[in-house]
Structure formats: structure tokens, C-alpha cells
Amino acid sequence: MTDSDGKTDKSGEPAAEVEPVVSKPYVMPDDPEDDALDALNKQLAEAKDRTLRTLAEMENLRKRTAREVSDARTYGISGFARDVLEIADNLQRALDAVPADARAAPDPGLKALIEGVELTERSLHNALEKHGVKKFDPAGEKFDPNVHQAMYEVPDPSIPVGTVAQVIQAGYMIGERVLRPALVGVAKGGAKAAAPE
């Protein structure tokens, strides 16, 4: 026997060279339990996906509902507020109809009536503001068709073109929305209005 080079075998004869055996991975025959496990894993993944989608949908629904409730609180009185604005306009017209000399007259009954109408108008505007309805008077502003309604053009060269020269009726906003646009006269003469920065 020789050393462990593998040149000779136990009988002393030269050993035949042996090629190394490459083993292939063992493939188990199809096991019904593995198929069932794969099916269960697939069902679990689908259930997780459905659960995540349902949770996301519920969160979106919660946010949308909260936004709709907020909008309903803010804008729900729009129809009522429009009707009340007509009353406010009539009170203002009544005050505007009183001549200046009649206001200065010493008649205490007339003064009390004028003060009563003024207090009523102020109280009405305070109630509207309490509910988010705000009056705006755009005199001197650049004309914006989103919040102004042009009724006519004013030929005044001292006012830049496209500027609100006269306000016929004030506008009202509720939250960020226009409840009623301001009725205005827009300047058509003079220098161009500077673009807002």
C-alpha cells in the first residue's frame, strides 16, 4: 500500500481514476401537502391585499366624509344667506334714500327711525359674518371676473383700464366661495392697470 495519493488500492494495484460525482439537487416528488400549503399561502396573500385595500378605502371614505361635513357646515346656509342678502340690500337702499338734509333735521322720530334701520342692518351683517358670510367692496381693485360682474364701462381716463371704478352692489363670500359677485362699473380709459405681483 502506498500513500494516500490514490495511486494504488488496497491490493497494491494501481487504482483507476474516479471522476468526481456531481450531485443534482434532490427533487421531492409532488407532495399534496406542499400544494395545499402553496394554495393557503396564496389565499393568505390575497386576503392581506384585500384587507389593505379595504383599510385604504375606509380611510379615504373617512376623509371624504369629514370634508363633506365641513363643506356642509360652511356652505349649507348659502341659499338662506342669498335670501337674507336681499333684505340687507333693501335696508341699505332705505338708508341711501334718506336725503342728507332730512338726516340733519331736528325731528327726533326720523332720527330714531334712521338709527333703528342702521342698527338692524349692522345686526344683520354681524349675524351673516358670524356664519362665515363676508361682504367685500372691490372699489379700486383690478377687475376679476371670478368675483365681479361688470355691468358697464366707465370712460374715466384718470383710472387705469380694467380697474373697478364704481360699485353698484357689494359682493359677498362664504368661506372661499363667491356667494354673490359684486356688480361693478369697470374703467375703460387711462393707463393700463399694473399686473398683480
UniProtKB/Swiss-Prot annotation:
PROSITE patterns: GRPE. Residues 1-35 are annotated as: Disordered. Keywords: Chaperone, Cytoplasm, Stress response. InterPro entries: GrpE, GrpE_coiled_coil, GrpE_head. Its main location: cytoplasm. One of its GO terms (molecular function) is adenyl-nucleotide exchange factor activity. It is found in: Cytoplasm. GO terms for biological process: protein folding. GO terms for cellular component: cytoplasm. Residues 1-12 have a biased composition (Basic and acidic residues). Belongs to the GrpE family. Homodimer. Participates actively in the response to hyperosmotic and heat shock by preventing the aggregation of stress-denatured proteins, in association with DnaK and GrpE. It is the nucleotide exchange factor for DnaK and may function as a thermosensor. Unfolded proteins bind initially to DnaJ; upon interaction with the DnaJ-bound protein, DnaK hydrolyzes its bound ATP, resulting in the formation of a stable complex. GrpE releases ADP from DnaK; ATP binding to DnaK triggers the release of the substrate protein, thus completing the reaction cycle. This is Protein GrpE. The gene is grpE.
